[in-house]
């Protein structure tokens, strides 16, 4: 697909569509739906790990709902474009914590961020992560589903990772900052090989297993 907006649902084997359009396109099997946050830049540059990751989710019997974002609006995608059974129940009881929730929001059973960094502000919010924690926790608390950060290493190649472990700055991006928001079970999915990002199959299996 050729993305033309800053935030959109991605389906590699068919044209991009909104959550609502995809959900109305047919009956969904009773499989867990996983919201996945992806870098828009990586979608545009056709990084090979994105279709590989989505395919692995599908092969595991999961329904991926991938959204590409610029990085700084991850909290908007989670807050407005994703909903859950818990949030639906709360809204039916009059507890509308997220007034900006889209009527076409996709219902998910878990959320996976392949970006790292704080949920609110992304890379731009790293220096103010502590100040935004309450906002992030409020957004995630309204959804009340697992929030997992499973990101490839964007500033470290696979060779150095396997030999020396995850570097200091990369560790902050992948572990420390997301954990402030309440992320659980962080997984490093892969890393750089030249200019491209590749997945490590064993790490992907840990995520979806």
Regions found by a protein language model. Give the residues of each.
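An N-terminal assembly and electron-transfer interface module characteristic of large anaerobic redox
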Residues: 1-209
